[in-house]
A protein has these predicted regions:
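Contiguous C-terminal substrate-recognition/catalytic subdomains in enzyme active sites
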Residues: 173-175, 180-228
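N-terminal Rossmann-like NAD(P) cofactor-binding subdomain of oxidoreductases
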Residues: 1-187, 204-206
């Protein structure tokens, strides 16, 4: 069995990761770290997992007991952790934040889009998981880049739901503000643009990075429930 640990286990991303790992026949979750929820049951936070696990959040980090470590932390926290902790050399790491998605001589993380880097991922100890928008956009554009067809400007208009903003509430995350509404955020400057450009140029070196414009919007459609 592959023993896995998770740091930052209380967010939406972690909840989905926990569900996937619980249902994986070859994985055993050794610990789920969350300093703000230490001692609480996983199902107290991720109620959709009720009946699936009796695991409890911990503030401990027994890194020498696991084979793979997942980071579900806020952007910037993974890098801080790696720089301040003695991580076992043979420990495999999968980072779900944006800290290591861009290639650099300063780290050895591989961009974790299997449709693009499957072989390299299999041989790597450190994997940077792609962003959500970046994944769906690349799956649409990479086949064109592979055949060198991205020779004109690329316009992307993408819409996401409320969970994309994370579990922490904010002024624009309330139901009364989002309900049946559509709003633009980070126009033409979304943090996923650099990784999209990086992947497109990997397959089509002639692609001009300034040729892609990315407009993101958030929405929460109204749902009508019939009353009996």
């Amino acid at each position: 069995m592959i023993k896995a640990g998770i740091i930052g286990g209380a967010g939406y991303t972690a909840g989905e990761l926990i569900r996937l790992l619980l249902n994986h026949p070859d994985v055993e979750i050794a610990f789920i770290n969350s300093s703000s929820n230490a001692g609480n049951k996983i199902t107290d936070v991720h109620e959709g997992l009720y009946g699936e696990t009796d695991l409890v959040f911990t503030d401990e980090l027994p890194l020498d007991t696991i084979d793979v470590l997942f980071f579900c932390t806020a952007h910037g926290d993974t890098k801080k952790f790696m720089e301040s902790h003695n991580v076992p050399e043979d420990l495999k790491i999968i980072d779900l934040s944006m800290d290591y998605r861009i290639k650099s001589d300063d780290h050895d993380f591989v961009y974790g889009l299997p449709e693009l880097n499957r072989r390299t991922i299999c041989q790597s100890k450190h994997v940077a998981n792609p962003g959500c928008f970046a994944t769906c956009i690349q799956l649409g554009l990479l086949p064109l880049a592979k055949h060198l067809l991205l020779n004109d400007d690329v316009m992307v208009n993408a819409i996401t739901g409320s969970t994309g903003a994370g579990v922490k509430p904010g002024a624009t995350s309330h139901f009364s503000w989002r309900n049946n509404n559509l709003s633009i955020y980070k126009p033409f400057s979304h943090q996923h643009v650099p990784e999209i450009k990086q992947s497109l140029k990997q397959l089509q070196n002639s692609f001009h990075s300034e040729s892609i414009s990315f407009l993101t919007e958030v929405t929460l459609p109204v749902v009508f429930l019939p009353l009996s």
